[in-house]
Regions:
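Short active-site oxyanion
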Residues: 30-34, 68-70, 109-111
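A generic structural signal for short hydrophobic patches within well-formed alpha-helices
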Residues: 10-11, 41, 120-121
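Acidic, PIN/NYN-like endoribonuclease modules and their adjacent C-terminal/linker elements
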Residues: 102, 106-137
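Short, well-structured N-terminal submotif of metal-dependent ribonuclease cores
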Residues: 1-36, 49-62, 129
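Acidic catalytic patch
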Residues: 68-89
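Conserved glycosyltransferase catalytic-site signature
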Residues: 7, 98-99
Length: 137
């Protein structure tokens, strides 16, 4: 099974003072194939850069470059799907990165998400929006 990793888990694993640090590290050290998007990479790098230090951001990126996770590019079709998600969930404040993550996960058939972000638990997909992601972490 594949596991999509959200910014919240990448960040928590890099920040030793984060309350989710141990859980995040445990998830990332599992034997499951990990996936993330280029948008999550940029969002995480930016958070690490400004909240911790540039060195933390570079270590994170270096880890991804070394194969820690498959980095899936967000394409034009994913952006359109993300737009449609926004239209369908007007009552939610999903970020653009979350919406593109949902779109990529659906495209790749990934139903498991490592996230501390409640939006991943709220989002529903499939016919009549009956399916939810399995949240790990």
């Amino acid at each position: 099974m594949s596991l999509f990793v959200d910014t919240s888990v990448w960040y928590a694993a890099a920040d030793s003072s984060d309350t989710g640090n141990a859980r995040a590290k445990a998830v990332l050290n599992s034997d499951e194939p990990l996936f993330t998007t280029d948008h999550v990479l940029v969002e995480t790098w930016t958070l690490l850069r400004y909240r911790i230090h540039r060195h933390a951001a570079e270590r994170f990126w270096e880890g991804l470059r070394s194969g820690t996770s498959t980095i899936e590019p967000v394409g034009t079709a994913d952006l359109e799907a993300a737009w449609q998600i926004g239209l369908s969930y007007r009552d939610q404040d999903f970020s653009l990165v979350d919406r593109t993550s949902f779109a990529v996960m659906q495209r790749l058939g990934i139903e498991r998400a490592a996230s501390f972000d409640d939006d991943f638990a709220v989002f529903r997909f499939g016919p009549r929006r009956r399916h939810a992601f399995v949240i790990v972490g």
